[in-house]
Amino acid sequence: EISCSLVGSEMCIRDRSRNSADTSLRIIHSLEYYDMDIGRMVLSGGEDISRYLSAFGVDLFLSCNENDVSNAIHAGFAAGMIYARDTKYSFPDNQIRIAFDADAVLFSAESEKIYQEHGLEAFNENEILNQDVALQKGPMASLLKSLSWLQNETKDLNVLRTAIVTARNKDTGVRVIKTLRAWNIVVDEVFFMQGAKKADVLACFGANIFFDDQDVHAGPASDVVPSARVPYKEGEM
């Protein structure tokens, strides 16, 4: 399990494992072998790791363990369940690229719930009617805010690029743009896919990671870029 925090202009990566302290030497040797710059470790011996996230100032928690990810989400942290793939991904040199879905990821699930319960037409009507009302923050909003700050701090280096890849169309996308303005956040690229498949666009963007709330999008995307599913909070949908 990997978490990261943004300190100053540096991104700190930490390993959080359910292994015991007795197994730590093998983990340390593996990190050295793969030349991974991870200095701080938590070996919880099987205990829930989410309780320690605040102590380490974590901005993002990633794991293949859905229960740990759900616990982190409920505790108020940006978190995603990574899809384990054997794919050898290709990444842009000297730049980190992070892509997000919109509803139930960057923004709350309020609009997604309308779509799930009442259909696309009701969703479109609601978003156009409320285009001047900013969407509520979702589980990844705090991460995007931190990334936006980091971009501003390192803008001369051009080491970070962000994108939104959403199933919304251009008309319902107006609310997305206005919400980002209200948050004083600039995203480099936005793709309003109108329900089209996201994987090809993500491959062209060259995402180092993509966050989506639905397996129907995150699953296929994980074949071309590292992807993580963001679970809903209990009772949210």
Where are these regions (language model features)?
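Active-site neighborhood of HAD-like aspartate-dependent phosphohydrolases
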Residues: 1, 92-141
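Single conserved hydrophobic/aromatic residue that forms the stacking wall/gate
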Residues: 2-8, 12
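Residues at the starts of beta-strands that form the adenosine-phosphate
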Residues: 10, 78, 161
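Short, structured motif recognition centered on aromatic/hydrophobic residues
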Residues: 13-16, 38, 53, 57-62, ...
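A cross-kingdom feature marking solvent-exposed beta-strand/loop segments within repeated
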Residues: 23-70, 75, 80-88, 178-212, ...
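Conserved acidic, metal-coordinating active-site core of Asp-based
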Residues: 123, 139-141, 152-161, 169
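Eukaryotic modular interaction domains in large regulatory/scaffold proteins
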Residues: 148, 163-166, 170-192
